């Protein structure tokens, strides 16, 4: 299924720790961060700030809401987390549409990857090395420790810094000014602390990488290539601004990687499928440029990875509505790997365009028997039902899906559309309210739920449910505003 990000990108690149997202219906405890005496951040406080940051990011940055890519980076990220030490909280991995090379982590369990990383990482191990580095920032609580270090210099720093980061997401000029003002007078200490954090994240990241079965040398290899490529650049990529690569850091990472046995890993097809999907849809290049890239790569890529080239070309043809070119490519790919979620997602879109949604439904039902409740398959299945005007069935599936995945905007968008087309105006408004809440647009969320409440029978269970949600949203709004 095809989804496109919206909004412009504010590049807030903070290499730091992360913790788990708060479920949207859970009560939020207001942290005691604003006091002058506060000099430490608890895990609970980090969770609250992280949830707030993520809601603002969804509103102000082009977060990629692509089910297939989300599944890929989530699986890869959690494979690494399973091998990391000192993991005390869940992780959430997401992507931002930006050709710049960067990744960052922040409060709340969130690790962000720029889509540009896939254009520069030459293997899954190299991508995993960046993710392992960010995971280490999380497990070692570098952002919290950095703020605590500042608090020892100025007692008000934690409250000011945490609030200014939220402002930076909402209004970059105000936030950056607030950060600069807060940290004035202690810059050199912060620089030294940041360098120490980077080396520590490298050390823990390489250990995680090796333990998870990836090539530990991928990290120094990626570092070396970046340093060589941008050594004399007047405008280096954001990653080199937030993650400086002095020679001693590269040398240190190389020496640490040598402590692990060298690995010769076969290229991983799913990584190259994800890369092809990004080039076709999220690289900011036109169709001709994408097809040219695939044509050049086809001549030099390993035979086992040729399916990624065919897949990438099929996506371009699909987006160009050249279905006669896309169909034979996707049909062959599905024949070779009938359970591959990249292929099933694309061929479902193709069958919808060809007015053959029943074929997509049959394929997805078969796949769901193998992996029930899978996010990629469920979202595509609901969409296929929707395109066949099977609104009641789609709503039933999406209600369960949004209950289990309350932070997935894709589910709420489809649920809103299904209810709208069925004429369930109140439920349509409620789903739209959840989308607004996920984007920190509290006033709009409350407005939609208020309208929903006014549409249903006075005193009904539906009205009670809507009114209870309004109360929750009002509390969340006030607590969110108090963090700024």
From Swiss-Prot:
Binding-site list for Zn(2+): 133, 137, 198
Pfam families registered for this protein in UniProt: Peptidase_M48 (PF01435), TPR_19 (PF14559), TPR_8 (PF13181)
Keyword annotations: Hydrolase, Metal-binding, Metalloprotease, Periplasm, Protease, Repeat, Signal, TPR repeat, Zinc
InterPro entries in the record: Mito/Outer_Membr_Metalloprot, Peptidase_M48, Protease_BepA, TPR-like_helical_dom_sf, TPR_rpt
First-listed, main subcellular location of the protein, grouped into a coarse class: periplasm
Positions of TPR repeats: 307-340, 341-374, 376-408, 426-459
A GO biological-process term: chaperone-mediated protein folding
Subcellular location: Periplasm
One MF annotation (Gene Ontology) recorded for this entry: zinc ion binding
Ranges in a coiled coil: none
EC assignment: 3.4.-.-
Signal peptide segment: 1-23
A single cellular component GO annotation: periplasmic space
Cofactor list: Zn(2+)
Record keyword Repeat present: yes
Annotated catalytic residues: 134, 202
Gene3D superfamilies registered for this protein in UniProt: Metalloproteases ('zincins'), catalytic domain, Tetratricopeptide repeat domain
First-level EC class: hydrolase
Keyword DNA repair: no
Cofactor comment: Binds 1 zinc ion per subunit.
Protein task: Functions both as a chaperone and a metalloprotease. Maintains the integrity of the outer membrane by promoting either the assembly or the elimination of outer membrane proteins, depending on their folding state.
Annotated family: Belongs to the peptidase M48 family. BepA subfamily.
Protein name: Putative beta-barrel assembly-enhancing protease
């Amino acid at each position: 299924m095809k989804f496109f990000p919206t909004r412009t990108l504010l590049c807030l690149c903070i290499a730091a720790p992360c913790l788990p997202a708060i479920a949207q219906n859970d009560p939020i405890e207001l942290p005691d961060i604003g006091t002058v005496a506060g000099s430490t951040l608890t895990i609970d406080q980090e969770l609250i700030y992280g949830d707030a940051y993520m809601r603002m990011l969804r509103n102000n940055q082009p977060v990629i809401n692509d089910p297939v890519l989300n599944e890929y980076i989530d699986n890869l990220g959690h494979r690494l987390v399973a091998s990391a030490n000192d993991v005390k909280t869940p992780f959430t991995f997401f992507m931002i549409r930006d050709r710049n090379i960067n990744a960052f982590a922040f409060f709340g369990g969130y690790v962000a990857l720029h889509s540009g990383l896939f254009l520069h990482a030459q293997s899954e191990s190299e991508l995993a090395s960046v993710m392992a580095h960010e995971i280490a920032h999380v497990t070692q609580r570098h952002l919290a420790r950095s703020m605590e270090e500042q608090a020892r210099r100025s007692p008000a720093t934690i409250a000011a810094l945490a609030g200014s980061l939220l402002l930076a997401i909402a209004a970059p000029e105000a936030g950056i000014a607030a950060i600069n003002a807060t940290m004035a007078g202690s810059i050199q200490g912060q620089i030294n602390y940041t360098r120490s954090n980077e080396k520590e994240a490298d050390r823990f990241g390489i250990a995680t990488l090796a333990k998870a079965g990836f090539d530990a040398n991928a990290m120094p290899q990626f570092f070396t290539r970046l340093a060589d490529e941008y050594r004399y650049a007047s405008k280096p990529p954001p990653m080199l601004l937030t993650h400086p690569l002095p020679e001693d850091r590269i040398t240190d990472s190389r020496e640490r990687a040598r402590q692990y046995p060298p690995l010769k890993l076969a290229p991983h097809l799913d990584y190259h499928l994800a890369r092809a999907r990004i080039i076709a849809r999220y690289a900011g290049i036109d169709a001709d440029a994408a097809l040219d890239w695939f044509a050049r790569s086809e001549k030099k890529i390993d035979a086992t990875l040729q399916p990624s080239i065919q897949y990438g070309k099929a996506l371009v043809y699909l987006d160009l509505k050249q279905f006669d070119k896309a169909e034979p490519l996707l049909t062959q790919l599905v024949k070779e790997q009938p359970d591959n979620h990249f292929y099933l997602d694309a061929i479902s879109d193709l069958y919808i365009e060809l007015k053959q949604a029943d074929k997509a439904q049959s394929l997805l039902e078969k796949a769901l028997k193998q992996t029930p409740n899978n996010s990629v398959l469920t979202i595509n299945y609901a969409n296929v039902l929707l395109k066949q005007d099977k609104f009641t069935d789609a709503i039933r599936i999406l209600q369960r899906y949004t209950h289990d995945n309350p932070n997935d905007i894709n589910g709420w968008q489809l649920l809103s559309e299904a209810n709208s087309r069925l004429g369930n105006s109140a439920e349509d408004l409620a789903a739209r309210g959840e989308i607004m809440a996920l984007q920190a647009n509290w006033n709009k969320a409350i407005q939609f739920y208020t309208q929903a409440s006014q549409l249903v029978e006075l005193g009904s269970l539906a009205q009670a449910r809507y009114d209870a949600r309004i109360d929750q949203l009002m509390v969340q709004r006030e607590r969110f505003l108090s963090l700024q």
